Structure formats: C-alpha cells, structure tokens
Amino acid sequence: LKYIFVSHMESDECGGLSVFFKEYPDMTVICSALCARELPGFGYQGKILVGSPGTFYSDKAIHMQFFDYPSEVHLQSGLLCYEKNSGIFYSADLMLRFGNGSGKTIKRAWKQEIEAIDITRIANDEKLKKLQGELLEISPALIAVGHGFCVECEK
C-alpha cells in the first residue's frame, strides 16, 4: 500500500490510519491542507502529501486531480479526487448511498450524479455550483463513495 486518500477530517474517514500505518509504515496519506495540519494532533506520524484543489499529482502509476470539497455543514476544506488512469472518482460523502453496498454497484449517468448534489451536501450555493461545473469536465468510469453503493458511470 503506497497511498491512502483522506477526503476530510472525520473519524469515519481517517480513524483507522494507525492500523494501516503500523502495517505499511512507508505509506503516504493524501489529504487537504486542513487535514494535514490536524492529523499529527491525532498521533499520525507518517508521510503526508497535501493535495490542493485545482492541482494534480502524478507518479508512475497514478495521475490524480483534486477538487475542493467544502464538506458537511461546517464547509471545512475537504478534498475530492479523480484518478485518471483508473477512471475512479473518490467522492467522500458527496455522493453517498445508504444501505450495505459491500460487493455491489449501481449504474447511473455521471451527469445525473452531479445534478443530484444539492444544498444538503454543500451548504453554500456558490460553492455548490462551482463544484458542479468543475465535475462536469471529467468523465469517471466509477464513483468510489465514502458510504454505501459505488456507482458505475453510464455514458
């Protein structure tokens, strides 16, 4: 395991880092600047790579594009990620699904997923519209959700 992507600083997104770090001490956490500042306060001592909205990170195996994720009602600076080589969009809690999605996927058009993002997911209309516009510029094959069923994107 080389990387772990942490979308935002909540226990269900990063609470198990110490378990992974113990097994993979050379791993790197990819996260927002806010999360990078907070992780050491929770005991994480490993490598951290800060992803900034509108930027990219590449190595031999991956090519990641980062998006601002004003997550939850607090509008904290989280991060969304699109890995271009695999076509996977890591959506955090933005496109979550309820229910046990273990081993299951659903099919839906990417545009429908973007249009379904509403003020309950991003509680600022200006930031919501900006993110929707940015996401319309990519075409993922799969949405890896933070909770529930992953989504196979239909064309």
Residue ranges with predicted function:
Residues M27-C153:
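Metallo-beta-lactamase
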Residues L17-V19, F42-G43, G103:
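Short amphipathic alpha-helical segments
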Residues K2-I4, A61-M64, Q112-I119:
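Short, basic, glycine/proline-bearing loop/turn elements
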Residues H8, L34, H147:
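Conserved H-loop
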Residues F5, I30, Q65-F67, F89, ...:
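Hydrophobic/aromatic beta-strand patches that form the interior of the parallel beta-sheet core
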Residues P25-M27, E152-K155:
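Short acidic, glycine/proline-enriched helix-loop-strand junctions
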